[in-house]
Every structure is written in structure tokens, then in C-alpha cells.
């Protein structure tokens, strides 16, 4: 398994899917190795739920992801981690791993829901090695890329997209 963090969320509207871009964490053994990123398509509401979990934490009135985490907590369990376990592009499959009474429980989930839960609970996120090897793209370290260049590259990329690309 490869440990990942959210690199960015690209919000879209209408029929165009949003993207969640996960980037592998820098390995301790070789910090100069290029990092890989994995893009997962999702709906705009799902992307907004993840973004809301990152940006503002809990809503005044709990939304579904908050409610589920409150339930897990009330039962004395803990969201241990989430895993992206299978991919049949453009569809990805995830597992939420919950620790309760000393036992691990693996629950099937959509990646967007699993990620939304992870960001709210600070649970680590992982991607199967095979998925990252097949579908990950090599990217430069974020620190080495000038922000202006990054925005220009992204702008160029966005202008080349059409709805048929998704």
C-alpha cells in the first residue's frame, strides 16, 4: 500500500466530473524520488463534501459523513484508515477500515465517501501498489515547482479539455 494525501480537488459543474488528485507521500529512504499522483473522478457534491471537511471542519448541523463518524465514536470504534483497493477506470473502489473491540472491520465504500471520512477524522489514506503503478502519474515535488508555473500549466491543461475527455 502507498500512503497518499490530497494534492488538490478540481471542482467542476454540470456534466463534467470533479477530480480528486491524491499524491503519494515522500518516502523516507529517497526523498529525491519523483512522487506519483492518482486522479479519481467524482461528482461535484462529493467533491464539495471532501472540500468542506478539509476547509471548515464540522458543520453546525452534522452532515452524513459527520453523522457516521459520530456513530462510530459513540460505539467506541475508530476509523483506522481508508484504502483505495480496486480500479476499473474510471471507477475506483475503496474500503473503510474501522477498529472496534480489537477487531478490524472492512467496509466497502465509494472513494469519495471514504476520503470525506478520512479528512474529517484525520485517518491515513492508502492506495494499492498495483493501482498506483498502473494508473499513477509521475509528478515533481510540490516545493520544486514555482506556483506561477503550476498555475500556467494547469490553465493550459484545462483549456485542452472537453466533456468527451471524461
PLM features per residue range, with description:
Residues 1-166:
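Divalent-cation
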Amino acid at each position: 500500500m502507498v500512503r497518499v494525501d490530497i494534492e488538490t480537488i478540481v471542482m467542476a459543474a454540470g456534466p463534467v466530473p470533479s477530480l480528486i488528485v491524491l499524491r503519494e507521500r515522500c518516502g523516507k529512504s529517497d526523498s529525491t524520488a519523483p512522487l506519483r499522483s492518482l486522479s479519481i473522478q467524482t461528482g461535484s457534491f462529493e467533491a464539495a463534501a471532501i472540500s468542506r471537511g478539509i476547509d471548515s471542519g464540522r458543520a453546525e448541523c452534522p452532515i452524513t459523513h459527520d453523522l457516521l463518524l459520530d456513530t462510530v465514536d459513540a460505539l467506541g470504534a475508530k476509523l483506522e484508515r481508508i484504502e483505495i483497493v480496486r480500479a476499473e477506470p474510471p471507477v475506483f473502489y475503496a474500503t473503510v477500515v474501522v477498529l472496534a473491540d480489537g477487531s478490524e472491520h472492512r467496509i466497502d465504500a465509494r472513494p469519495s465517501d471514504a476520503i470525506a471520512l478520512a479528512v474529517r477524522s484525520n485517518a491515513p489514506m492508502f492506495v494499492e501498489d498495483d493501482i498506483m503503478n498502473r494508473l499513477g502519474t509521475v509528478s515533481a515535488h510540490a516545493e520544486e515547482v514555482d506556483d506561477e508555473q503550476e498555475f500556467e500549466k494547469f490553465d493550459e491543461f484545462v483549456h485542452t479539455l472537453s466533456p468527451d475527455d471524461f
